[in-house]
């Protein structure tokens, strides 16, 4: 019977080592690596979740704080509207007031029936639309309202959020500060009561006669996208007109744009009905 070939001692030792040590070691290391990777991923997800939760809490606090700041600024504007409304009502009622010669000289009429201011002189712009025939225009009223020009100027200068201060009458007369060339900017047959910055303050839309905010609209005075705080001016139960303070969307975005939003977010200004009132342009970097 032939003898079985002898295996070299080294091969026998290697096989024994492979079976008893190396393979179990590789298996254990594989398991440990798997556990490490799983644990590391779990820890990473926990850390990301914690950071996200922390960021959202910080953002919530920042938004609430910023909201209170903006709310206080807007309430200040509402208070200014109330002061301006009272001044306009008094100016309309005081027929004893005599406008100076400069105020008379800075007004002119077009052949089409527009009564308008033609020079700045540090005063408000004035525009009586041709939608009211010239013979029915209360031009004394238009000149009498020059009495409130200093207040309009003070309101505009006191609050950087305010882009313009104005009064619109029931018969399509507009007085607005700062001055601009109304004849070039406004439609000559402009029917002012048809605009939202007028009718939203009327008895139908605002029966409580308080200060209300418009939705965002394109300003006919050329100041871009705008929202206005407006309030009615009554003589008894007759609506003489509407006063307003304009705030541009760009100015509101400048207020909200400083808010640091994580996760590549950005700030929006949302109205009470959840309508977006102001948002940054796409790719604006905000």
Task: Please name every model-derived segment.
Residues 2-49, 53:
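Extreme N-terminal signal-anchor transmembrane helix of membrane signaling/transducer proteins, especially
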Residues 38-85, 89:
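Juxtamembrane membrane-water interface segments immediately C-terminal to a transmembrane helix
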Residues 71, 85, 89, 152-160, ...:
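Short regulatory alpha-helical segment in sensory/regulatory domains of signaling proteins that mediates
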Residues 79, 83-93, 109-117, 150-160, ...:
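Extracytoplasmic ligand-binding sensor domains of the Cache superfamily
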Residues 90-144:
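Alpha-helical transmembrane helix bundles of large polytopic membrane transport and channel proteins
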Residues 126-129, 173-180, 274-280:
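Amphipathic coiled-coil signal-relay and dimerization helices
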Residues 145-157, 242-286:
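Solvent-exposed, extracytoplasmic
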Residues 156-246, 254:
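Extracytoplasmic/periplasmic ligand-binding sensor regions of membrane-associated signaling proteins
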């Amino acid at each position: 019977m032939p003898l079985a070939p002898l295996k070299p001692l080294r091969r026998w030792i290697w096989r024994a080592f492979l079976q008893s040590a190396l393979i179990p070691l590789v298996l254990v290391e594989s398991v440990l690596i798997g556990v490490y990777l799983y644990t590391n991923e779990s820890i990473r997800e926990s850390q990301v979740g914690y950071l996200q939760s922390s960021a959202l809490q910080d953002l919530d606090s920042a938004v609430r704080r910023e909201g209170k700041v903006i709310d206080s600024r807007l309430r200040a504007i509402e208070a200014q509207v109330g002061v301006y409304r009272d001044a306009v009502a008094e100016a309309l009622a005081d027929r004893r007031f005599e406008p100076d010669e400069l105020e008379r000289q800075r007004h002119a009429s077009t052949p089409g029936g527009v009564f308008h201011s033609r020079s700045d002189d540090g005063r408000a712009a004035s525009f009586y639309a041709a939608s009211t025939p010239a013979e029915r225009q209360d031009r004394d009223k238009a000149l009498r309202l020059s009495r409130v020009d200093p207040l309009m100027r003070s309101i505009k200068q006191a609050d950087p959020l305010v882009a313009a201060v104005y009064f619109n009458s029931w018969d399509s007369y507009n007085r607005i500060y700062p001055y601009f060339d109304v004849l070039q900017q406004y439609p000559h047959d402009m029917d002012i009561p048809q605009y939202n910055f007028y009718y939203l303050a009327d008895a139908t839309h605002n029966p409580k006669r308080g200060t209300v905010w418009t939705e965002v609209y394109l300003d006919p005075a050329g100041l871009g996208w705008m929202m206005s705080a407006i309030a009615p001016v009554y003589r008894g139960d007759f609506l003489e007109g509407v006063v307003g303070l304009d705030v541009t969307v760009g100015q509101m975005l400048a207020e909200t744009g400083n808010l640091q939003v994580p996760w590549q977010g950005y700030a929006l200004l949302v109205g009470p009905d959840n309508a977006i009132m102001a948002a940054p342009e796409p790719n604006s970097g905000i």
